[in-house]
Design a protein with these regions (language model features):
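Short, well-ordered amphipathic alpha-helices
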Residues: 5-13, 125-130
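Short, electropositive alpha-helical surface patch
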Residues: 78-92
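Alpha-helix-loop-beta-strand connector modules within alpha/beta enzyme cores
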Residues: 40-67, 88, 109-137
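Glycine-rich, proline-tolerant flexible connector loops at the mouths of alpha/beta enzymes
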Residues: 5-6, 13-49, 69-75, 94-119
Length: 137
């Protein structure tokens, strides 16, 4: 979730049974990215600010980078977020099917969270997939 953690992961290798092991990829979570900024994990950190963290990581690592995008934002903003991340060289994104006010699953205190409808969530995934195909990924 930072250049430092990415550098540690990039350099970490262990030998086990005569075989060298290392991490296959990096994951940047919205939780850690928010907490590093002293903010709650409620989608308050905007993509433009998260890009700063992504650039630090990309600078020191050649490993594939997977980005947790929470809900992915509004359907209208979704393709623009994907385009920006594609241009940065992000390998994959993960989005949640939650709607309404963001509540981190780790800290939900028993509160129920609303899920998007299957049709809405499928539409978001299909739009994202279609847009990525247009970018020739």
């Amino acid at each position: 979730n930072s250049g430092l953690s990415a550098l540690i992961i990039e350099k970490t290798k262990i030998k086990k049974n005569q075989e060298e092991k290392e991490y296959d990829a990096l994951w940047i979570s919205s939780l850690c990215d928010s907490l590093l900024r002293g903010k709650p994990d409620i989608e308050v950190v905007e993509l433009k600010d998260r890009i700063n963290s992504l650039e630090w990581i990309i600078e020191v690592s050649n490993k594939p980078l997977i980005v947790d995008l929470d809900s992915g934002g509004s359907i209208e903003h979704w393709k623009y977020s994907l385009r920006t991340l594609y241009k940065l060289g992000i390998s994959a994104v993960v989005i949640e099917d939650k709607t309404g006010k963001k509540v981190n699953s780790l800290f939900q205190n028993g509160k129920l969270q609303e899920q998007d409808t299957i049709s809405n969530f499928c539409e978001k995934i299909q739009l994202g997939k279609h847009y990525i195909e247009q970018l020739n990924i």
